[in-house]
């Protein structure tokens, strides 16, 4: 129905392009007129446009500086400060409107200027990443359209080879004229450096400065790069610099400016694929015990082996029953226990390809899932532990607990959590206990709960490491280290770590050195970081399938830009086989056929393991080929460059999907162009589209097809029953293949199901983080205020006034002069001894006023004794150190709250609502503690004598060394959104790792580690070289 309407009225994309066409015509007319100008004349035109843009904004900038100057006056009244802040808010809105207005006015001239600059640069030879490059690019009309879409704050979807990098220069140039700074976000350091060097000639021709932020840069270098008109960098670098700026000890340490305009390259990768993993700065946990996994690993090792033997016996039982009674319920139950006990068992996966068995297992599972899975325990009780592969959770059964207690020679109760509420109630009701004894017994209960919950958590993580994470799939082991493989790109993520003890569990499993734990010090999600920008835009080859998410989360519209030349690539229906073995044999046969013909083929794989399996099979057939995966990625540029040559065979993980351009060799067009052969479907349609997009660039011929088997991960977990039943009905023999549009559509529906589930995770992540985001804004605003002011005396006095009122109010009902005197001496070092009867004579307000005057007099004496500069440092230290310390503690409490909040679903409560209420209560307490401790420190802190100063300096150096060990963490939201769809069901307590695990990016790689820039070289031979 929708397609009929589009044919009659035109699609949304057609209408978007139609609106832009008149401006494109105007740009081309202007560019023709600019051709008559001399080079100096064109540069003069650029200066005029810059002058127009900055001239329109200058009066508002001057007004802002004037207001900020008034606001920084030391003793400005509170009412005046509020009025100025309101005026600044209004001015900010006017400033944004003025920016939009002036840029719309000069857009046609600026785009025409950039186009003519590109024309004049043709033939210009310069260096990009150490290689000579000749400029040969002038924007086409479709690229001008893409540039206008980006400038308007939307997403421009452009096919591979359509020149997205050149398109970006148009809106970058236009917005850089304001002097407010434009950020260009790429997926790795290598692309940031390459794109900066590649496009710099256009910008420098007109005097615009261009910078790049790289992982290895020091803060002073970063500050210089951010001061440029245009700054390239990765989303991680921009995000971590934001967090580091909000941990800075002085204004001079801050590196970033305001967030004005960001253009995100490969926007779907950055804003969607990585949006499940927040950015986190973390530091080492003091006194962390890393031996706990080594202690329990032998038990888990034995437990897993016993489970494997048990599963094997169930498989044998099922086979026996099926020989005489096909479709028998007992056989289905035995196979269901195998699925719950060891879902990745190869013998089980092979059995499922037999006619009717997949349907039997599904039917049996549905029977036990009825009534909120109330009977599923009948299946699981016979196992040592139950695995829910789809949700990523593992649950230890009573049988498993008994086995572990016998193995560890301990009571099985140690694997059960005590009911803290009931235990505390019993202690409270015991009249024979004194208050001190009650406190002691309560502490013992809390300690017992903490010890047991930690042990159970470690057991769960080790079981996950053994059952759900496979070497050469989710991770590889290199140089004695566990290295995570990015599921979307197939690249190794140097220095990143899973969180929540999972990485340590995998290290224990692989018998490598177990690294230390970390704790969160600052965090922000990708979504909330990019919301800081006044204007956001993005470009990619694959955004349309996620258009609704882009709009709902970021308010970004997607516009599909027409190609310069029609795409003639042939996309064929999927070829479906029963087993992986049949599929791999068919892949090898197809590759052999294509190589004999001379047509180059790119075989896309989803994991390192599959790429190596296919490579072994091709070697067996003596077919020459290249392999590009996380283990061999150091030859990436060389392999990709040769992939389009005649007879080339290239096996690649998803690495070859982005940032690569495969050009065809001579004679290849006549053979049909590059052949894309996908060895399985990815869970995201976008990744498959990226792979197909490697062929058919700029009107080149090409072909693409996916080979799929029912044993593939996607089909096993989410495959439609319809596909299985069709295979069964047709009674296919071994090696037979199904090729039908209906099958392809069923597979795409399975992918859509996964995408919807992942969207739910990201949306839930945002709902939870929005709570923390509001709190973060308040804390960072207070911190910035403390950082920028020379003196904070008026802020201290405001806190003092509130403190005096609060303290006196507490003693209003039961006035205790001695306790009040002791408290003031302890908290402020102020002596204040109220006489008896003072409360009756003066009342609460009178006493509060006297207390305020006494404390004020104390502070005034302190100000006279201490030089003003030192006094300013004391106030600043009091504010910043307390905020930093308390915010770290608050983040730890919020993490703990998130971990257990889904259990509230048992009480028929909405976990999100409960989380909001609890987080607000914690935040109110946080603000009260910050105010009290800041005031206390400002009053009690005095300069030290020279000996003490030297001791403090030594401590500060030690602290500085500790700070250097800070690690930047890219953390997945697993602990918050455990089992999102089922948080209200009986599985809520199994809160799972639905979605990616937490990842931690360490601050600096080792000399022999892979360089994080993506070049493929070792760090010591790349960005780690000494200057």
Swiss-Prot record:
GO molecular function: ATP binding; metal ion binding; protein-exporting ATPase activity
Bilayer topology term: Peripheral membrane protein
Binding site for ATP: 143, 161-165, 661
Keywords for this protein: ATP-binding, Cell inner membrane, Cell membrane, Cytoplasm, Membrane, Metal-binding, Nucleotide-binding, Protein transport, Translocase, Translocation, Transport, Zinc
Cofactor remark: May bind 1 zinc ion per subunit.
Catalytic activity: ATP + H2O + cellular proteinSide 1 = ADP + phosphate + cellular proteinSide 2
EC number, UniProt record: 7.4.2.8
Necessary cofactors: Zn(2+)
Chain positions covered by the region annotation Disordered: 981-1027
UniProt xrefs under NCBIfam families: secA
Protein purpose: Part of the Sec protein translocase complex. Interacts with the SecYEG preprotein conducting channel. Has a central role in coupling the hydrolysis of ATP to the transfer of proteins into and across the cell membrane, serving as an ATP-driven molecular motor driving the stepwise translocation of polypeptide chains across the membrane.
HAMAP family: SecA
Similarity section: Belongs to the SecA family.
Name assigned to this protein: Protein translocase subunit SecA
Lineage, broadest ranks: Bacteria, Pseudomonadati, Chlorobiota, Chlorobiia, Chlorobiales
């Amino acid at each position: 129905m929708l397609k009929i309407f589009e044919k009659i009225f035109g699609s949304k994309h057609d209408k978007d392009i139609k609106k832009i066409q008149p401006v494109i015509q105007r740009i081309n007319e202007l560019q023709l007129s600019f051709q008559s100008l001399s080079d100096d004349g064109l540069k003069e035109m650029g200066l005029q446009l810059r002058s127009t843009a900055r001239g329109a904004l200058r009066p508002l900038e001057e007004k802002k500086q004037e207001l900020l100057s008034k606001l920084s006056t030391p003793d400005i009244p509170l009412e005046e400060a509020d009025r100025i802040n309101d005026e600044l808010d209004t001015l900010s809105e006017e400033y944004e409107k003025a920016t939009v207005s002036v840029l719309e006015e000069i857009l046609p001239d600026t785009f025409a200027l950039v186009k003519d600059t590109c024309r004049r640069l043709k033939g210009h030879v310069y260096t990009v990443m150490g290689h000579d490059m000749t400029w040969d690019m002038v924007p086409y009309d479709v690229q001008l359209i893409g540039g206008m879409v980006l400038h308007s704050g939307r997403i421009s979807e452009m096919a591979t080879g359509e020149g997205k990098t050149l398109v970006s220069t148009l809106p970058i140039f236009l917005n850089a004229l304001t002097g407010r700074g434009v950020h260009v976000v790429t997926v790795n350091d290598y692309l940031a450096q390459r794109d900066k060097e590649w496009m710099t000639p256009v910008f420098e021709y007109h005097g615009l400065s261009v910078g790049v932020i790289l992982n290895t840069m020091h803060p002073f270098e970063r500050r210089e790069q951010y001061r440029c008109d245009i700054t390239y960098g990765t989303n991680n670098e921009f995000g971590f610099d934001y967090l580091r700026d909000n941990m800075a000890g002085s204004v001079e340490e801050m590196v970033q400016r305001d967030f004005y305009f960001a253009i995100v390259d490969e926007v779907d990768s950055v804003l969607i694929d990585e949006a499940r993993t927040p950015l986190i700065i973390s530091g080492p946990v003091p006194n962390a015990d890393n031996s706990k996994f080594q202690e329990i690993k032998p038990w888990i090792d034995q437990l897993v082996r016993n489970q494997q033997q048990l599963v094997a016996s169930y498989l044998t039982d099922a086979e026996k029953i099926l020989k005489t009674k096909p479709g028998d319920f007992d056989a289905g139950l035995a196979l269901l226990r195998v699925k719950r006990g060891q879902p990745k068992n190869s013998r089980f996966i092979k059995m499922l390809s037999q006619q009717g068995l997949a349907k039997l297992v599904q039917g049996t599972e549905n029977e036990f899932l009825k009534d909120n899975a109330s009977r599923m325990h009948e299946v699981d009780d016979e196992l040592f532990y139950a695995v829910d592969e789809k949700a990523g959770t593992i649950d230890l059964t009573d049988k498993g607990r008994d086995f572990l207690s016998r193995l560890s020679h301990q009571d099985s109760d140690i694997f059960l959590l005590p009911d803290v509420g009931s235990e505390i109630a019993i202690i409270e009701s015991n009249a024979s206990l004194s208050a001190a004894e009650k406190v002691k017994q309560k502490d013992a209960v809390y300690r017992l709960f903490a010890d047991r919950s930690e042990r159970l958590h470690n057991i769960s993580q080790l079981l996950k490491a053994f059952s759900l994470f496979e070497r050469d799939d989710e991770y590889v082991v290199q140089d004695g280290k566990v290295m995570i493989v990015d599921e979307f790109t197939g690249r190794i993520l140097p220095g990143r770590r899973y969180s929540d003890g999972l990485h340590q569990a995998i290290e224990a499993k692989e018998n490598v050195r177990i690294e230390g734990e970390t704790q969160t010090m600052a965090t922000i999600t990708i979504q909330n970081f990019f919301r800081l920008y006044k204007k956001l835009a993005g470009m990619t080859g694959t955004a349309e399938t996620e258009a609704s998410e882009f709009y709902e989360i970021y308010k970004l519209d997607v516009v599909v830009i027409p190609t310069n030349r029609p795409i003639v690539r042939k996309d064929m229906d999927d070829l479906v086989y029963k087993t992986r073995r049949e599929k791999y044999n068919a892949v090898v046969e197809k590759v052999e056929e294509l190589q004999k013909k001379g047509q180059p083929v790119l075989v896309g794989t989803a994991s390192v393991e599959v790429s190596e399996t296919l490579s072994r099979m091709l070697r067996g057939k003596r077919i020459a080929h290249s392999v590009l995966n996380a283990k061999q990625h150091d030859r990436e540029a060389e392999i990709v460059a040769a992939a389009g040559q005649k007879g080339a065979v290239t096996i690649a993980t998803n690495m070859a999907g982005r940032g690569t351009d495969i050009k065809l060799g001579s004679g290849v067009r006549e053979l049909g162009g590059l052949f894309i052969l996908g060895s399985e479907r990815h869970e995201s349609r976008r990744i498959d589209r990226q792979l197909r997009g490697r062929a058919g660039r700029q009107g080149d011929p090409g072909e693409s097809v996916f080979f799929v088997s029912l044993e593939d991960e996607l089909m096993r977990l989410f495959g439609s029953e319809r596909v299985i039943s069709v295979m069964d009905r047709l009674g296919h023999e071994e090696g037979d293949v199904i090729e039908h549009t209906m099958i392809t559509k069923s597979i795409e529906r399975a992918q859509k199901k996964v995408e919807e589930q992942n969207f739910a995770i990201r949306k839930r992540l945002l709902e939870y983080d929005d709570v923390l985001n509001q709190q973060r804004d308040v804390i960072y605003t207070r911190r910035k205020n403390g950082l920028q002011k020379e003196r904070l005396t008026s802020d201290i006095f405001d806190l003092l006034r509130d403190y005096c009122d609060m303290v006196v109010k507490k003693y209003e009902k039961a006035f205790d002069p001695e306790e009040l005197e002791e408290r003031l001496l302890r908290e402020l070092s102020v002596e204040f001894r109220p006489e008896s009867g003072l409360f009756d004579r003066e009342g609460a307000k009178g006493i509060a006023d006297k207390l305020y005057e006494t404390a004020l007099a104390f502070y005034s004496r302190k100000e006279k004794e201490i030089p003003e500069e030192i006094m300013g440092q004391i106030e600043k230290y009091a504010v910043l150190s307390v905020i930093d310390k308390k915010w770290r503690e608050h983040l730890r409490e919020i993490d703990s709250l998130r971990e257990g909040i889904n259990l509230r679903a048992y009480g028929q409560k909405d976990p999100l609502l409960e989380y909001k209420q609890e987080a607000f209560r914690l935040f109110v307490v946080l603000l009260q503690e910050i105010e009290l401790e800041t005031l206390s420190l400002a009053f009690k802190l005095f300069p030290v004598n020279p000996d003490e100063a030297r001791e403090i300096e030594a401590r500060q150096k030690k602290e500085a060394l500790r700070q250097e060990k800070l690690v930047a963490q890219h953390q997945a939201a697993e602990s918050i959104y455990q089992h999102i769809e089922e948080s209200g069901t009986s599985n809520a307590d199994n809160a799972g790792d639905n979605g990616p695990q937490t990842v931690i990016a360490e601050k600096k790689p080792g000399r022999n580690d892979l360089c994080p820039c993506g070049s493929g070289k070792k760090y010591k031979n790349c960005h780690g070289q000494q200057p």
